[in-house]
Amino acid sequence: DIDFAAVLEDASAKGTVNVYHWWTAGGEKDAIESVIDEFKGAYGKVKTKSNAIPGGAGGAMVMKVKVLQQAGKSPETFQAHPGQEIQPYLDANMLLDLSKLWDYAKLNERILPGIKDLLTAPDGKNYVVPIGIHKTNVIFYNIHVFEKYGIAIPDHENITWGEFWDICDQLAAKMPDGEYPIDLGDRKGWPACQVFEDIMMGTDPKIYQDFINGIYNVEDVTKVLTTYAKLMDYVAPDHSSRDWYEASGQVVAGTYAMQIMGTWMQPLMTSMGQEYGKDYGIFTFPGTDGWFGMNIDGFVVSNDSADVEAGLRWAYNVSSTPVQQRFSALKESISPYTDTPDDCYNELTLKFKNELISDTIRSYPSFTHGTALPWSASMSLQTQVQEFATSSDHDAEYFANKIVNILKEAGVKGEWNLVD
């Protein structure tokens, strides 16, 4: 049995921690470097090895970790989304129960209200230490493009579907050949799936709840995909040839006016010298006013690595206030902890944080980002939705049948309660 207090309080301990994460884009890279820097300050004799596994939405991580574990080289700690995504690791019996770490670091008292349930596994234990929260249902737009083509920017961020289609129509009419109202940047598939998720929530939260609970019908999914097909009329036709961050670069360049993306796009915009309110603005995805699409990043610890104690020290340090302050400022993410001071946030991140803790805004779990659907179903869904987005005719009913079959085959049975 591990003496958690003794391990975590031993600042002179030696060892090596292999840290696997998926942060490679501008701003994200600086954020993870700041965590490593703080870790070195706390446990100076422990060597840190940073390993970036890009692949997006955490999908590539599960496969990488499985391979490492089978080779007897489980990483000491690695990034994960809480919820269904950690199930393959639990099935492999490779995660260390961090409930005692949670007690020692007083995480139960410190954690933001409303996210604790997402961080508790079905067996009642805690395996994840959260590091940051992002909102998924957001549209970023280039203010200069709107001004260039004389598109009136609404004085409110919670736009309706009608306002959204009107903006798309105006942009499409005025932008020259080779420039488009929207880009997806879905070379890796998951951004296309996240748009599907946003459209589903923006169509009807009840359809979303049923979908993640495994109560599905082809008609509902067809309805969502029909809206998606309409959206594709405004999207750059070569959208799947770019990664999400390359698409963001083209939004900054003015080739595309808008991108539907989570708030991890913020630090990327900052790294490209873009300022919120001056260079870019945001809309809440149409139909999702009053909802916060939840994406929680965290770290888990392997119970079978070469240095389990080093992994524990890393996970503990992630929740410390100095790490949270530096990381949240650079990543422009919301700290999961109530004792992280608000002065580490810029204007936009603070706005999102206030939304998250507001009594009038409800959060919902992402199925693209590992929380709400089994990992295998989420991966298959990403592939299928990307195929839909890249298909020439966007046949909603055909793909709705394929998507429903994915949930059937995965035996999806959820107990999510989003709508009264």
PLM feature spans:
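Extracytoplasmic/periplasmic substrate-recognition and gating elements
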Residues: 41, 47, 71, 149, ...
